[in-house]
């Protein structure tokens, strides 16, 4: 059995705002970046070593240099206004919502790619698919703030500046799904790994998440096991605390017939690996939601209760083939 290094995702720092930011006070954050070395080939055919951190550092400099002496940033445009503590899944929802709004009102969409390690890693992973950067890759002036976690259409009068929120609903980009899939295509695995099910389990140590989101229960996982296809042989565990998550599953009789493996990837690489699973059991997690939506696995099993508050529903399951328990 393989184990993985445990990295706690942390929580969010104090911010004094209304709307969607009002509940995010007194919450510390730790951003992380996973190093990944790979070979690249120069024009002479020689291999040279390159790291993701190096790419990100160069991209950050490019954001600053590209803004000098250029008038392109004066054109009317909107952009995501990222919030401290946002992780990859949150950022993808925000980008998708703002891209969709920009198309509805016919203005450009630019992204503050230099905002954090997570956004810089995402920019590097998207490559040529990445949208144009904001000035110096930073957040722009706040123009709109999401009122709550419920789906609320963005007013068409919002035609410039930064749009702040989590926008965790597929309704925000309904009608342009092919465009969003193309934009995020580099994050998606081409092939599936036969006989695998990816199970995402959030253990958590964040008091805000404990009060806001329902964590996966043993009962949910037991019900999910009963829905897996007969040809599934291996469980790949994706978690903020993979050792604890795997220990939970191993003790359940429903999973006794499977072999187990803990995924050790982070960020974009973890998302890419999740999309290669033949089937997925997702948690109350934006990242695993995107893995299911982008990866289109044969079967997706998702929790019905996403938030602790009954009035707030999970990101759109309507007209979905997902199995909701």
Residue ranges and their predicted role:
Residues 119-131, 244-255, 312-317:
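Short, aromatic/basic amphipathic alpha-helical patches
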Residues 83-93, 209-210:
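A short, glycine/small-residue-rich beta-strand->loop->alpha-helix junction that serves as a flexible
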Residues 88, 228-303, 308-309:
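Donor-binding and catalytic core of enzymes assembling or modifying cell-surface/extracellular glycoconjugates
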Residues 77-79, 108-114, 198-200, 236-238, ...:
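A structural signal for short, well-ordered beta-strand segments and their strand-loop junctions
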Residues 309-325:
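Leloir-type glycosyltransferase catalytic cores
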Residues 1-74, 129:
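Membrane-proximal basic amphipathic "stem/tether" segments
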Residues 93-102:
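Histidine-anchored nucleotide/phosphate-binding helix
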Residues 45, 54-55, 59-78, 114-232:
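Secretory-pathway luminal glycosyltransferase catalytic domains
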